[in-house]
Amino acid sequence: MKNVFKTLAVLLTLFSLTGCGLKGPLYFPPADKNAPPPTKKVDSQTQSTMPDKNDRATGDGPSQVNY
């Protein structure tokens, strides 16, 4: 009898936890045909991989950048 309760408890826990990973609404309404498509502004600035100056060194202390 103890094995039945343990098995049912494990199954109930597993079934209840499977819903935890689901995200978003359970019902997806039809898309609005009159709505404009979503746009996102793209920032085209590129960042160099080598820093211009290392601000971590104080005075003649060690620096992480070879000049």
Curated annotation (Swiss-Prot):
The keyword Lipoprotein applies. InterPro entries: LptM_cons. Keywords: Cell outer membrane, Lipoprotein, Membrane, Palmitate, Signal. It is found in: Cell outer membrane. GO terms for cellular component: cell outer membrane. It is a lipid-anchor. Component of the lipopolysaccharide (LPS) transport (Lpt) pathway that promotes efficient assembly of the outer membrane LPS translocon (LptDE) by the BAM complex. Facilitates oxidative maturation of LptD by stabilizing a conformation of the LPS translocon in which LptD can efficiently acquire native disulfide bonds, thereby activating the LPS translocon. Interacts with the outer membrane embedded portion of the LPS translocon formed by LptD and LptE (LptDE). This is LPS-assembly lipoprotein LptM. The lineage of its organism: Bacteria, Pseudomonadati, Pseudomonadota, Gammaproteobacteria, Enterobacterales.
